[in-house]
């Protein structure tokens, strides 16, 4: 049973030491972005390998072509899917993301394929989980559900990328309610 029977990757994610620095570098090198930076992101619920614990992380989100790029910076040593792969000072590829409209069904498929659920969270009316697929791709695979409000946010970020010109700011302000 192939993992990508129905969905394509929508995201590549990288663990970095400094999210803002990574956004600046990718904007200069690849004209990626602009990026939205979410400092010290908090979830409504967060489970890591069956334990209710949440690491202190900052995220950066932007586009390079049609691919969303995510940068992750962990500010503490709490056990996490990030510390599973990287110690302090280390950086690199972390996960690919699938935007799915049948979250429960896709979780069941991943379970049937024998991958281990490493992390699950709920934030901003969105469910997401990460399966440990390091034996397959050297990282994790994220399943991210697709409610309309998140699709609208992603479309706005993608449009900002389409309008981006070399030299524009790498980071754009985050609009919050």
Regions found by a protein language model. Name each.
Residues 8, 124-127:
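Short acidic/glycine-enriched loop/turn segments that link adjacent beta-strands
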Residues 119-122:
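Short beta-strand
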Residues 40-41, 124:
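Conserved beta-strand edge residues that scaffold enzyme active sites
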Residues 42-47:
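Short, charge-patterned binding micro-sites
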Residues 1-10, 14-36, 49-116, 132-177:
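Glyoxalase I/VOC metalloenzyme domain signal
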């Amino acid at each position: 049973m192939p993992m990508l029977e129905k969905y394509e990757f929508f995201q590549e994610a990288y663990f970095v030491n400094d999210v803002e620095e990574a956004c600046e570098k990718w904007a200069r090198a690849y004209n990626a972005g602009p990026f939205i930076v979410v400092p010290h992101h908090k979830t409504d619920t967060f489970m890591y390998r069956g334990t209710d614990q949440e690491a202190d992380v900052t995220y950066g989100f932007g586009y390079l072509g049609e691919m969303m790029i995510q940068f992750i910076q962990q500010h503490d040593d709490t056990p996490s899917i990030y510390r599973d792969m990287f110690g302090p000072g280390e950086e690199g590829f972390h996960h690919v993301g699938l935007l799915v409209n049948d979250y429960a069904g896709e979780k069941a498929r991943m379970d049937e394929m024998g991958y281990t659920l490493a992390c699950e969270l709920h934030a901003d009316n969105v469910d997401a989980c990460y399966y440990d697929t390091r034996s397959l791709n050297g990282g994790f695979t994220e399943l991210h559900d697709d409610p309309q409000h998140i699709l609208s946010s992603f479309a706005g970020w993608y449009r900002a990328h389409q309008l981006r010109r070399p030299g524009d700011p790498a980071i754009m302000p985050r609009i919050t309610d």
